[in-house]
């Protein structure tokens, strides 16, 4: 039997998908901009 691949960690989640992580790169800023334009309630993790 194989182990479950999803091992949740809030720290890892924030570091890779958080708002500050998004704003650190050009691509991430584009992600935030797209989500703002779409009207998402949550912009990032």
From Swiss-Prot:
One of its GO terms (molecular function) is structural constituent of ribosome. Belongs to the bacterial ribosomal protein bL34 family. It comes from Shewanella loihica (strain ATCC BAA-1088 / PV-4). One of its GO terms (biological process) is translation. Residues 11-20 have a biased composition (Basic residues). Residues 1-10 have a biased composition (Polar residues). Keywords: Ribonucleoprotein, Ribosomal protein. Pfam families: Ribosomal_L34 (PF00468). This is Large ribosomal subunit protein bL34. Residues 1-21 are annotated as: Disordered. GO terms for cellular component: ribonucleoprotein complex; ribosome.
């Amino acid at each position: 039997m194989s182990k479950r691949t999803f091992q949740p960690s809030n720290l890892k989640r924030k570091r890779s998908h958080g708002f500050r992580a998004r704003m650190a790169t050009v691509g991430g800023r584009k992600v935030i901009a797209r989500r703002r334009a779409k009207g998402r309630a949550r912009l990032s993790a």
